[in-house]
């Protein structure tokens, strides 16, 4: 029988795995910082620096950036902040994975716990959960045409969705913020928080338009000795673009959650 074949390529899910790790480290307070009286607030982010696919396992390397706001006995400041980088490197066993596979890693911060050993040293314990999603390339051959007089062929057009591009990119925003007239000048920034709201993305020709709002909170030491701790808030509109050569007007976009 005479027929034509065509190769079809795709990406298929292969395996999933979750792993929980604990980062435990004692950290000294820098000489330039006042003594720690009490921890007030903590937070952190995970920076994944490397992922390596191996036979039956995956290596992940990165750091947890810890930030803390604490109270002091210093009457001129009362509040101070500190930051530490806590490195980690882990191997997770996943049966059947190969160096040619692809991995997507997500994380959740389950717990951040601090213990004050003394006024110059704190113990930091972080509990993280990593989710690994393994995919592999698929290549299959399918019959698209049969050249035979005695063979009947039924054809049907089917709409399919094709993955054009799957990548990460960074939208860089730069704004100059002016303090309200009733606020003291900034001597030292202690704590910042940035929250995004109503974030939306729209496909354009070879670009992605991003719109929304950015709420900024800053806690700082002012130059006014009578009111040393000050804060300020801003709401900034977001309207920027990311270059994406693969995108066209009929492309469907999915933002990560």
Describe the function of each predicted region.
Residues 1-33, 144-183:
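Alpha-helical, hydrophobic structural elements that either
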Residues 14-17, 35-40, 50-61, 116-121, ...:
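Short, solvent-exposed beta-strand/turn "edge" segments of beta-rich domains on protein surfaces
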Residues 22, 43-48, 61-63, 85-87, ...:
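Extended beta-sheet lipid-handling architectures
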Residues 41-53, 104-117, 191-203, 253:
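Short amphipathic beta-strand and strand-loop transition segments with alternating hydrophobic
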Residues 47-49, 160-222:
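Surface-exposed interaction/gating patches
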Residues 58-100, 137-154, 208-211, 215-249:
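Extended intrinsically disordered, low-complexity coil regions enriched in Ser, Thr, Gly, Ala
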Residues 104-149:
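Hydrophobic, ordered structural segments
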Residues 251-257:
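Conserved small/polar residues in nucleotide/adenosyl-binding loops
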């Amino acid at each position: 029988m005479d027929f034509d074949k065509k190769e079809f390529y795709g990406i298929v899910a292969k395996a999933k795995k979750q792993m929980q790790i604990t980062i435990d480290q004692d950290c000294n307070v820098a000489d330039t910082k006042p003594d720690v009286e009490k921890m007030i607030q903590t937070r952190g982010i995970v920076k994944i620096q490397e992922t390596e696919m191996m036979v039956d396992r995956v290596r992940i390397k990165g750091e947890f950036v810890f930030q803390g706001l604490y109270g002091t006995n210093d009457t001129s400041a009362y509040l101070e902040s500190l930051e530490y980088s806590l490195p980690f490197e882990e191997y997770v066993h996943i049966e059947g994975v190969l160096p040619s596979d692809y991995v997507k890693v997500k994380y959740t911060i389950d717990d951040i716990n601090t213990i004050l050993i003394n006024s110059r040293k704190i113990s930091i314990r972080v509990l993280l959960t990593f989710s690994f999603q393994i995919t592999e390339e698929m290549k299959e051959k399918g019959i698209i045409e049969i050249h035979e007089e005695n063979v009947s062929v039924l054809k049907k057009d089917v709409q399919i969705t094709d993955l054009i591009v799957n990548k990460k990119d960074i939208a860089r925003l730069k704004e100059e913020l002016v303090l309200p007239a009733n606020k003291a000048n900034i001597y030292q920034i202690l704590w910042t928080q940035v929250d995004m709201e109503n974030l939306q993305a729209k496909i354009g020709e070879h670009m992605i338009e991003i719109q929304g709002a950015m709420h900024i909170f800053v806690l700082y030491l002012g130059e006014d000795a009578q009111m040393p701790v000050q804060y300020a808030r801003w709401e900034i509109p977001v309207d920027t673009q990311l270059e994406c050569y693969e995108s066209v007007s009929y492309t469907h976009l999915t933002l990560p959650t």
